[in-house]
């Protein structure tokens, strides 16, 4: 195993910055300590230089145990110094002495009051100095050689450019969209497998497709492509990853949740991601005693265990459908029973990814499948082992066994290594930018032994080294594999991943290793990751770029290198979510273990618990049997905690609240109000996510989190923030509300006494009845760092809040999920004024959901339009298109009400030079109330152009995505092939549809996706069927089904 130095060097760099800041403080240090800190600073700087030399000179060599142990000592002392400094920062009130010119007496009082903590820290620093001296002496004593003494002539590292990489090169990427991609060189195979999955079996029984092959050969890629293509033909679908170390309850619960959500959606054009009606918020009733909150009695625990063990039939649970909250408390027996009941009368398709043993199939999967199901259901299984595949598909075609009654014939498909020209074709297809094709490509694809994972990763390496000479690539091939390669084994895969990892700059190594926090197969949000990188200090201001821009550049480079796989793009063309390949995740996890960078408890792989201190903890287990899985771990130095799954217990009492900086509890159902109170004691916390938890209130003590940068409370029961949130000086992102249900988060405002609200004789109020959350004395001048304010609610009583928005001059995104104000109210005028002002300050994203539509229509003649907008969303009954939209040359994404869908509107919008996606929408909930009105408006709109909406020729030069989401979509026509020349995808969701004409002449249009909601009339179904059956190009998908 190679010596990993990426994360260690990044930690050292961050630490040196903190030491420099500490030395600059005039009043904080006890006499004599400044010299110790300076010594530690100089010693660690030399160690950092040594680390950097190691990463450049000696990577590709196996390091002896002495160097590895010495590196471990460097890392440990650096971590301990960082903890000491962070502890110092929160124990001493720096601002009170440094922000003012204090008198001699005040200075002495400060020194007296802080004498004890400063003395304690001085003692710890002295000990750390001694440790640093000992580490330096030990290196000489035991002969740890300098990097220049090591021979690097055979190093496989293509390193000419990486250390000095210009990150601005990767800051901006061209917007693009993800579509269903065929695995390279497998067109015929995919067609055959798709046909087998969709054609009925003679006895209409359940059938299993097992896809078998070596890790990295493309099993999951094939399975996912098939699943996405055919899933729309089934009543319900679910996919789950199992892997080597799985949790039975979590596997079953994941499948059940997916099936349940599809039933709840009922085929409508909009659906909620959670059941808002069946779950009660935490804290909505009277607060229980602390003893009741902190521990259950033995009797209660016994009853809960008994309930989980009993079948639902004995608990009276078969009468009605279980709620999401009930499912979260079910045991395995109840989960199996509920799944069997829900699937019994449905035609289902399941994707079970990465099964490692026949026991898993027989004991976990088979028990929940209905024994009698004649609906032609299908199961897709992926596994590395032929024996497991044969167990899952016992009646596959290579066997002489015939189908048994009630079951269809199974299929086992083996995925082999690529041969012939296929490796080179995949290599060329995996390089994002056009590059000159040379013999280099053939040589590099050949050493990958036909393994797709190795090929695409090596192609990413080439893409990021465009100026490297062919001779250097030839040397690289020879150093990696001196002998010809036919097929690649695990050691060969590791060599190639080593080569690609070693080419990364130190910052990118750290960012890549950080991904080992997430579970196998997890769909990772790009924005969530970027905010966490910033909070951890991995992405800092550099080369004139902001932290956010640097984080985006790092992400783009990892994607360009094919070390991560984008799986979902937003309508703005940027990556929304991505995944890490299983083998890449295993690789970076091994590196993280070596550096003690990430500690994972639970998850899909068995991970040896570190004997040293835990720094970043990822809890991935689920269920009560994992509740005490952190026993034996030293958690006093945990700086980052992430929870995945339904843990019953998280050991908050074991953490040092003074050093935790990242707390990501998204989706943890065990979070209680008392936990949130404890979180407010984590004084250096920078990132807090309690998204999708059952918390209903944020305590006022949140003001103590003066370093907090991100507060994510989306999809919780929190309806209003406390007034103290206005005192968070460093807050950058406040994310609240629920976009699916349009539930908004109220910003606080302070009520004034009634005497101040009495009108004057002229009928006017003497002063506002409320104060906005930024109008309080303590909050004045704060929140200047706020960049994102998303998911808020503005109503008639929010005039003070609307006025306070003026002060958020750094705001880049404002999303109002619920707006309900009357035109004569002061709130109307204040909000309009605030939006005009923020638009002039650099607002880039504006989203407004206006329930009565008066406000969005008032934007038409706005005197100072937001000229820097990149994304604009206006929801409601829009009467006319704001005339200033055409002046916004930076606009990339536009979502507007379908009520302004006219040929004239399209004529106006076609000249926007940067427009990537255009969406006409109307929410289903609003349409139910105004269905006749909306339909009448659309009928009038099309009458102006002979009964159809005509897409104008030419222009729309950048538009690649066109979407219509509404109950009624009128007739649309593309009369000229020059209309929307860059268009790649059309998406439509509707209940009533009048037709789509001329799409076959659009040269770049690849896919049309149609989703028909329940209740559609026969004429609509006929038009959809006709479009599907009579269109060869582009491909037409109806509810996910691609045309033949």
UniProtKB/Swiss-Prot annotation:
NB-ARC domain mapped to chain residues: 187-543
GO molecular function terms noted in the UniProt entry: ADP binding; ATP binding
InterPro entries: Disease_R_plants (IPR044974), LRR_dom_sf (IPR032675), LRR_R13L4/SHOC2-like (IPR055414), NB-ARC (IPR002182), P-loop_NTPase (IPR027417), RX-like_CC (IPR038005), Rx_N (IPR041118), WH-like_DNA-bd_sf (IPR036388)
Structured coiled coil (CC) domain as annotated region, ranges: 3-184
Gene Ontology biological process terms, A to Z: defense response to other organism
Pfam families hit by this protein: LRR_14, NB-ARC, Rx_N, WH_DRP
Keyword field: ATP-binding, Coiled coil, Leucine-rich repeat, Nucleotide-binding, Plant defense, Repeat
Stretches the record annotates as Disordered: 258-302, 737-771
Family label: Belongs to the disease resistance NB-LRR family.
PANTHER family registered for this protein in UniProt: DISEASE RESISTANCE PROTEIN PIK6-NP, DISEASE RESISTANCE PROTEIN RP
Protein name as annotated: Disease resistance protein PIK6-NP
Annotated organism of origin: Oryza sativa subsp. japonica
Name of the gene encoding the protein in the UniProt record: PIK6-NP
